[in-house]
């Protein structure tokens, strides 16, 4: 009888310990932050920026006609960076797959998302939709490995013009036709411009998403090059207010290019979900500072990048 009682008490101890662990994990109300390494366009740069603490990377995709051909930015670019690093797009995607596929020798558990900055400004109107179709085909074949143990990271498609919503429609249609509509759960969207003559209003951006057939998985970016003055962050604050409103359509907001400690702290204080930076180690340092480590943490794969975390 005593042995039986001891076994029962022992089992309850294990259960309670497990419950305490679960509660502790759920009780972590710190804002998860995506640490986006800026302008990672050569495969040799991938481990370098991951080693600096990035949990996400951004690459620039340039086109020949409607075909995504290179990861390349070109001049001018952020101060202190090599603007002409590049790789063939298919090779870059295959390499990303290696770093984000469990079991691969290069796998990095902390690498959870990448942003494709799609340079569609060079495209004619009739090339926009085919470009979206071609990017979907490249991702399906070279990153997702046609659905057979491909990379697990989330993908954000960043378009520089709200008028290019047909890109998204073409992208989605390819995955549906190929029988991989499920992969759209891994895809988010960011309409970031155009910048000239002025940035579109949030209402205009929302309308573009409706035309693209997108409801959810929405990221919004705001910022300037790292050599520009900080300014008052008026648009950023407006976007965060919209995100946190009852009828907000934005899920995540990131700010670029944030390289200074002071600007990093300011962006976090305002309420961003992500910071795009040339120095991921700066954000890591700030996240470990008093006043920040209790309110923010580096996002992990278990954090849903399409979930809205209000301020």
UniProtKB/Swiss-Prot annotation:
The active site is at 38, 73 (nucleophile). Binds 1 Mg(2+) ion per subunit. GO terms for cellular component: extracellular region. Changing residue 262 to A: Decrease in catalytic and hemolytic activities. SUPFAM superfamilies: PLC-like phosphodiesterases (SSF51695). Its cofactor is Mg(2+). The keyword 4Fe-4S does not apply. It catalyses: an N-(acyl)-sphingosylphosphocholine = an N-(acyl)-sphingosyl-1,3-cyclic phosphate + choline; an N-(acyl)-sphingosylphosphoethanolamine = an N-(acyl)-sphingosyl-1,3-cyclic phosphate + ethanolamine; a 1-acyl-sn-glycero-3-phosphocholine = a 1-acyl-sn-glycero-2,3-cyclic phosphate + choline; a 1-acyl-sn-glycero-3-phosphoethanolamine = a 1-acyl-sn-glycero-2,3-cyclic phosphate + ethanolamine. Disulfide bonds join 77-83. Its EC number is 4.6.1.-. It is found in: Secreted. CDD domains: GDPD_like_SMaseD_PLD (cd08576). Expressed by the venom gland. InterPro entries: PLC-like_Pdiesterase_TIM-brl. It is an enzyme of class 4 (lyase). Keywords: Cytolysis, Dermonecrotic toxin, Disulfide bond, Hemolysis, Lipid degradation, Lipid metabolism, Lyase, Magnesium, Metal-binding, Secreted, Signal, Toxin, Zymogen. Residues 1-21 form the signal peptide. GO terms for molecular function: lyase activity; metal ion binding; phosphoric diester hydrolase activity; toxin activity. Mg(2+) binds at residues 58, 60, 117. GO terms for biological process: killing of cells of another organism; lipid catabolic process. Belongs to the arthropod phospholipase D family. Class I subfamily. Dermonecrotic toxins cleave the phosphodiester linkage between the phosphate and headgroup of certain phospholipids (sphingolipid and lysolipid substrates), forming an alcohol (often choline) and a cyclic phosphate. This toxin acts on sphingomyelin (SM). It may also act on ceramide phosphoethanolamine (CPE), lysophosphatidylcholine (LPC) and lysophosphatidylethanolamine (LPE), but not on lysophosphatidylserine (LPS), and lysophosphatidylglycerol (LPG). It acts by transphosphatidylation, releasing exclusively cyclic phosphate products as second products. Shows complement-dependent hemolysis. This is Dermonecrotic toxin. The lineage of its organism: Eukaryota, Metazoa, Ecdysozoa, Arthropoda, Chelicerata.
